[in-house]
């Protein structure tokens, strides 16, 4: 999947990897995906199942994130009437289903934003 709700994912994946693990240099789990995150993805996924070890595989991790975002950005859309942005997705990744509205994820977003093209939103 190259985009999600019109949001290009490749630049966001790159930025998240930099913030979470210095692009894999400081952790085997590039995106710092937790067991709870994997369990949640397996619960909401219709036809895919992931193992905890799959967190160490970059492409499988990215697929888990896509599933997670597809599910939880719908809540964002329903509550705000707006399409998600890089900020929305990054904050959901960091703060869980309602991470987009948690104050504590704003600092995380500022760090991610620095690694995006032009340091800008979507």
Which residues does each PLM region occupy?
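A structural motif
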Residues: 12-13, 27-44
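Alpha-helical segment that forms one wall of the substrate-binding/catalytic cleft
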Residues: 40, 44-100, 113-117
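Long, amphipathic alpha-helical surface segments
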Residues: 103-122
């Amino acid at each position: 999947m190259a985009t999600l709700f019109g949001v290009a994912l490749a630049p966001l994946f790159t930025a998240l990897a930099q913030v979470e693990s210095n692009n894999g240099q400081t952790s085997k789990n590039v995106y710092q995906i937790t067991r709870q995150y994997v369990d949640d993805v397996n619960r909401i996924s219709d036809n895919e199942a992931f193992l905890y070890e799959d967190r160490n595989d970059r492409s499988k991790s990215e697929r888990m994130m896509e599933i997670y975002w597809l599910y939880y950005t719908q809540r964002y859309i329903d509550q705000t009437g707006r399409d998600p942005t890089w900020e929305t997705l990054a904050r959901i990744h960091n703060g869980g289903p309602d991470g987009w509205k948690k104050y504590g994820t704003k600092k995380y977003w500022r760090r991610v934003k620095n690694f995006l093209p032009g340091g800008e939103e979507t």
